[in-house]
């Protein structure tokens, strides 16, 4: 019987659904029980629907030109599940596509090829020790960090969210904070179950038992009283930004290290993961994760500087409003920021361009920067006007940045889009530090203008989690390694 085109399409779709459904329990088990995060060309598959798994495979076609069939990637997923692996992020798409279409196996069987590609985490004796984490503050970034840490919860969770610290509130405070975790106007509902234990001051979320501690100062807490020790304190309040202030956390019993989710002053290391994360030493007790804008632009600037050289440039950020601004006109100590955030474009300053030099010293003194706050609640854009050392063209520059996004050591920081229809809301929840909008790239000789989107909340929070892992000495490699 000859099938009609419609019947062929329906049969093909049902087959893809079938394989996606078979993949789901393997992906979930690998993540929960062994700490292995499966993705396809950077798109995470943990907790993904069958439709999301199918869509992730379309990404391969977009970037590589050839199809990766779900039945092909399913075979490789079964091999991964059969191996004794340490926690890692494994790109199933690159693994399968490399073997099937790029001859990366060099005559090896599929199993031997996978073993070779994953040998750095195969049959390793040493398992990472889990790190207790305390979120000091529970605002926009704090709640997104909580979502990310809860998402990673399981028997082999490397980062264990043990507590959040907030100022004392009135009756109903705990329910309100749990509700803010449960519902978010920008990022949508929490994916899971949240309950509150008022007697114990605990929020229970997807198997994570989160102690809520009420305190008025960072040096007044005994974390040992809650079974927490050697904790990494993630200060997301933005109140203390120097060594003296952040050092107060270390006076609390059970606290070991402090990470600030904002730019820091003085000699505190400003870390942009992917660029200078190896500067974090075991003896560093206080570190900062820089700003969302610095995280968005620095990886792209590093890649371009390494390949083309940068003489100088200007970075203009078109930034969503934040809760530092006023809802309606009122007094603010900063110029213009007192005007209604949701009604105005507000010209203001940013230290992001100068802060790049803290992570990338070779660009010190080469960049200027300014910012425009705009009436959108999330997702921002950096426009980088650069004078390069070498002449190039838009095609060459975009091809290079696509390769950076797919195959370089910055592939977890730099994303890439060639869509002519993408707008800011499409990028809410994007897990990369920045997304290069290739259709907007302008190049003439050695002058280049690049447009880089970034989710200034969620993408930044993902970078913060990576810095947390670095501070905890947790190895979580992305495999296969960059080509």
Task: Outline where the language-model segments fall.
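C-terminal substrate-binding/catalytic lobe of Rossmann-fold NAD(P)-dependent dehydrogenases
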Residues: 2-57, 307-309, 313-446
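N-terminal Rossmann-like NAD(P) cofactor-binding subdomain of oxidoreductases
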Residues: 2-326, 334, 466-467, 474, ...
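Short beta-strand-to-loop capping motifs
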Residues: 166, 386-390, 452-454
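Short pre-catalytic strand/loop immediately N-terminal to key active-site residues, enriched for Gly-Thr
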Residues: 284-288, 447-452
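A generic structural signal for alpha-helix starts
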Residues: 295, 391-392, 458-459
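Glycine-rich phosphate/pyrophosphate-binding beta-alpha loops
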Residues: 373-377, 453-460
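Generic C-terminus detector
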Residues: 448-454, 463-483
């Amino acid at each position: 019987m000859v099938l009609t085109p419609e019947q062929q399409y329906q049969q093909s779709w049902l087959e893809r659904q079938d394989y996606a459904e078979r993949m789901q329990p393997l992906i979930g088990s690998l993540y929960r029980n062994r700490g292995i995060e499966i993705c396809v060309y950077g798109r995470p598959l943990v907790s993904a629907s069958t439709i999301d798994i199918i869509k992730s495979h379309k990404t391969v076609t977009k970037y590589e030109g050839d199809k990766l069939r779900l039945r092909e990637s399913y075979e490789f997923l079964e091999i991964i599940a059969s191996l004794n692996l340490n926690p890692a992020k494994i790109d199933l798409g690159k693994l399968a596509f490399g073997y099937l279409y790029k001859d990366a196996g060099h005559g090896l069987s599929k199993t031997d090829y996978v073993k070779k590609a994953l040998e750095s985490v195969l049959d390793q004796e040493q398992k990472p020790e889990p790190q207790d984490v305390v979120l000091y503050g529970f605002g926009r970034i704090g709640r997104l960090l909580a979502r990310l840490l809860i998402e990673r919860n399981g028997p082999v969770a490397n980062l264990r969210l043990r507590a959040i610290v907030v100022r004392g509130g009135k009756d109903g405070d705990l329910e309100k904070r749990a509700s803010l975790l449960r519902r978010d106007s920008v990022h949508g509902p929490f994916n899971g179950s949240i309950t509150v234990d008022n007697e114990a001051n605990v929020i229970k979320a997807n198997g994570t038992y989160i102690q809520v501690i009420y305190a008025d100062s960072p040096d007044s807490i005994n974390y040992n009283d809650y079974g927490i020790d050697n904790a990494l304190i993630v200060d997301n309040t933005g109140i203390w930004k120097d060594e003296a202030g952040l050092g107060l956390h270390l006076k609390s019993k059970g606290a070991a290290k402090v990470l600030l989710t904002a730019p820091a002053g003085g000699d505190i290391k400003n870390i942009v993961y992917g660029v200078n994360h190896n500067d974090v030493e075991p003896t560093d007790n206080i570190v900062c994760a820089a700003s969302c804008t610095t995280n968005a632009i620095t990886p792209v600037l590093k890649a371009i500087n390494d390949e083309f050289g940068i003489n100088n440039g200007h970075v203009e950020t078109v930034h969503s409003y934040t809760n530092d601004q006023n809802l309606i006109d009122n007094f603010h100590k900063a110029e213009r920021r007192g005007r209604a955030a949701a009604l105005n474009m507000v010209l203001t300053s940013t230290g992001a361009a100068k802060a790049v030099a803290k992570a990338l010293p070779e660009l010190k003194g080469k960049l200027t920067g300014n910012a425009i706050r705009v009436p959108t609640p999330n997702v921002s854009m950096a426009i980088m006007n650069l004078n390069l050392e070498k002449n190039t063209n838009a095609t060459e520059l975009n091809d290079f940045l696509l390769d950076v996004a797919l195959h370089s050591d910055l592939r977890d920081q730099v994303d890439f889009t060639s869509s002519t229809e993408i707008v800011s809301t499409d990028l809410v929840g994007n897990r990369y530090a920045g997304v290069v909008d290739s259709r907007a790239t302008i190049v003439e000789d050695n002058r280049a203008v690049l447009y880089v989107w970034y989710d200034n909340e969620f993408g930044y929070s993902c970078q913060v989690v990576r810095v947390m892992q670095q501070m905890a000495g947790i190895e979580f490699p992305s495999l296969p390694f960059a080509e």
